[in-house]
Amino acid sequence: MDRPNKAIYLYQTSKGNHEIRTIQEPYVPKDAQSLVDVQYSGINPADTRHVYMDMSNYVAGYEFAGTVKQVGPKSPFKIGQEIFGISIPYNNRPNYLGAHQSFLLAENFMTFARPDHLDPITAATLLAGGGTAMDGLLNVLGYGFPPAGIPGDDPTNVPILIWGGAGGVGQAAVQLAKAAGFFPIITTASQQNHDVMKQLGASHVFNYKSPSVVQDIRNLLESKGWSLKTVFDAVSTGLGVFDGLTEEQEKAVQQKYNQSSSAMARQCCDPNIPDSELRLTSVLPVKMDPNYVFCLNFRPVEILDIGGEVTKDTKEEEMTKWKEWQPRIEKCIEWLIENHEKHWQPPRTRVVKGVEEGLQGIRDVWQGKMSREKLVIDHRV
């Protein structure tokens, strides 16, 4: 740590505030840890949302790319090696896990070697959206991924609706669905993003702002004889969960549940398919519909108590699933690292310089000022 370790710190207030701090504590890698000189870190809505999920009081940020400076005795990496990864969120986690700082300690979990053909900015934006899309498609929805030899139900020519294709998770889901063999791949996006969505692999794109969007999608499905039972809500808007709302405000939002992305996406499904056969996943818990299952970007051995989701499984059953699901995510990530040049177009990125600009970037992302754009902090200033 040859320079001041400037960081963006998340502390708990009713507004989920961040502030810039210089971290004084030295980071010394132990066991399988690696000390990383951070080049870039990716900004995500979770940088703010997690305070409303009772997670705070730590250095913010999850996605990172950088250079190994020191290693613990069990680290799989070498000094000077380029790596990237994503860290686990939890309340009062150690400062050394935060991505939005000059240096961090990377655990072995969800950390990968970065080959020369994968540039650091792409690497620093890959795992939050990509991992969530993988968990949704391969684990929650239960499909295989033939290109990587991941078993599961055959996705070939299975219709899928990805609501919110222009966001980070949506773009990843569209591209992975294309590689897996889903068809048709139907998505929603603002009108200005329709051409890009088709370039990424969507076969049909609808404007989610249109008052007739649900009927338009159903008309397409009926005209083609396609039966839709698979939905990936990649935005989960209008649910009122983890948005920093008061209890009264949350109830008011939930009273308008039929206007939420989750409700509208489900309304597009074949009405003749029973609930038990629907495959629905979302990026936030859907309290009003237990048929939706919340997807994450990784499945650690210790289950994260995030709350808000209705589940019929016991904790032991959940843990068994998570142990089976995490290797599937990692195998798909490894496939994507090797094949990203053919199958992956990263989100449009804008680099901000240092934690000062990064702090404003976090606020802009949370306020929804980005459209099909990912902000990345350059810590080499």
From Swiss-Prot:
Q: Where is this region: Substrate binding?
A: 276-304
Q: In which pathway does it act?
A: Mycotoxin biosynthesis
Keywords, alphabetical: NADP, Nucleotide-binding, Oxidoreductase
Q: Which residues form a coiled coil?
A: none
Where substrate binds, per the record, is at G130, G131, T132, A133, M134, D135, G136, L137
Cross-referenced InterPro entries = ADH-like_C, ADH-like_N, GroES-like_sf, NAD(P)-bd_dom_sf, PKS_ER, Trans-enoyl_RdTase-like
Q: What class of enzyme is it?
A: oxidoreductase
Annotated binding of NADP(+), by residue: 46-49, 166-169, 189-193, 208, 255-256, 370-371
Pfam short name (any one): ADH_zinc_N
The EC number(s) given in the record are 1.-.-.-
Domain of life of the organism encoding this protein: Eukaryota
What do we know about how this protein assembles, alone or with others?
Answer: Monomer.
Q: What does this protein do?
A: Trans-enoyl reductase; part of the gene cluster that mediates the biosynthesis of fusaridione A, a bright yellow trans-fused decalin-containing tetramic acid with antimicrobial activity. The PKS module of fsdS catalyzes the formation of the polyketide unit which is then conjugated to L-tyrosine by the condensation domain of the fsdS NRPS module. Activity of the Dieckmann cyclase domain (RED) results in release of the intermediate fusaridione A. The unstable pyrrolidinedione ring of fusaridione A is opened through a reverse-Dieckmann reaction to afford its ring-opened form.
Q: Which family does it belong to?
A: Belongs to the zinc-containing alcohol dehydrogenase family.
Q: What is this protein called?
A: Trans-enoyl reductase fsdC
Native species: Fusarium heterosporum
> Gene encoding it?
fsdC
